[in-house]
Amino acid sequence: MGHPRDGLSDGNGEGHLVMSLRGEYLGMPVLIDDLDKDNQTFYRYCGQNELRAQECLDCRLKRLPPTSACPFCASERMEWRPVEGRGTVYSYGEVHHAIQGAFRSHLPYHLLLVELDEQKDIPNPYDGLRLQGNLAEIDGSLATKETVKRVGIGTRVKVTFKQMGDEIAMPLWVIDQEAEQPTTPWRYPIE
């Protein structure tokens, strides 16, 4: 799990006291419990602007979000591996009524399910390496209404990170300006 020198090998840094990680996102407190080593490690890597996935040492399949055992073979043996952070919108939810007050000024906003280019259709045609995250602008702010209207299933995106504190960051998705985009990405008929 990581390398001893990066301070992330056990999810909390070798030789350090186990402590909850705290941050802030859109003015809301973020807490990653000290018992959640997998997510602590994931968000710490994000804090270093690195997107990493767990790779099973037995079946060699990557997985996101982090889990304590491989969903494909049930092995607990894994290592954190970097992934490129580019992919395609597999599905999305367009939110028009914010439950959290901090999101109200950003309506409508998108919650994307992105299928990463690594491990597409593996181990079967209906599976892949997927990660959720908000659609954002390149500066890490939530996407504008205009950007939301341009994104649908098939849009090419890449990861960016919004710092939430000294050690952790939130992975977000921005339109990949370097990638070929669909002329008209498929969108749910809501307007």
PLM ranges: what are they?
Residues 64, 78-79:
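Short functional micro-motifs and their immediate structural scaffolds
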Residues 90-148:
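Glycine-rich active-site loops that engage anionic ligands at enzyme catalytic sites
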Residues 55-58, 72-75:
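Short, cysteine/histidine-rich loop/knuckle motifs that typically chelate Zn2+
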Residues 128-190:
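Well-ordered alpha/beta subsegment
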Residues 49-52, 66, 83-85, 150:
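Short metal-coordination and nucleic-acid-contact micro-motifs, chiefly zinc-binding Cys/His arrays
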Residues 86-88, 156:
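Residue-level marker of beta-strand positions
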Residues 6-54, 151-152, 160, 165:
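A broadly conserved sequence feature marking short terminus-proximal activation segments
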